[in-house]
Amino acid sequence: MQITAQDVLVVIDVQNDFCSGGALAVADGDAVIEVIHRIAPKFEHMILTQDWHPAGHSSFASAHPGKKPFEQIELSYGAQTLWPDHCIQGSKGAEFHPALRLPQAELILRKGYRLQIDSYSAFFENDPTIPTGLAGYLEERKLTRVFLAGLAYDYCVGYSALDARRLGLQAYVILDACRAIDMESSASKIEAEFDRAGVILIESEAV
């Protein structure tokens, strides 16, 4: 596969709280860093996303008395999984993993910073009427093919890939550069959605 000037690598949420020892650790999450470092030099354009929640965020189980992490509730924009407190603005858990070294990244996109709305996708809040601005950023730069890596495969990576397709972009998920939470078969469910949407799954060796 030839990587061109119209391609962008989007590295999703490689942060301390999603890696080993973190508040919402994804199993083997740290392993994506080596793969990302290996493929990153092939891309002229790169964007990092960073989960960036205020304390007391509505997606935290602790904000809903009597609720526990991983339960589902209904919020104004639909179903919301409740999470342990994680990636709180300014905390060590919200920092990028210290081994992640991507100084060539052109943009750091913070998401989930609105108190009452969660944000899995790099393109939209969980309320799909609220864009993050990434679509416009890519359009201005004529970037039409999006390669996704990071955490977690079945949530923030997956939702970003699906939204890329809805916006008319080509979307590739680099499987060995991702790890999944895989809660209640969430990995297989997102893959079924990938198939319907035309998201392409590849390994890093194809890049």
Predicted region positions:
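Short acidic-hydrophobic, aromatic-tinged amphipathic segments that line or gate anion-handling sites
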Residues: 200-207
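Histidine-anchored nucleotide/phosphate-binding helix
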Residues: 35-39, 155-166
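Short, flexible loop segments at boundaries between secondary-structure elements
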Residues: 173-187
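Short glycine-enriched, charge-decorated loop/helix-capping segments at active-site entrances
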Residues: 20-29, 122-126
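Extreme N-terminal starter segment of soluble prokaryotic enzymes
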Residues: 2-9
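Short internal beta-strands
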Residues: 47-50, 170-177
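Short, well-ordered alpha-helix to beta-strand connector turns
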Residues: 6, 43, 104-105, 168, ...
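Active-site alpha/beta core segments
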Residues: 34-145
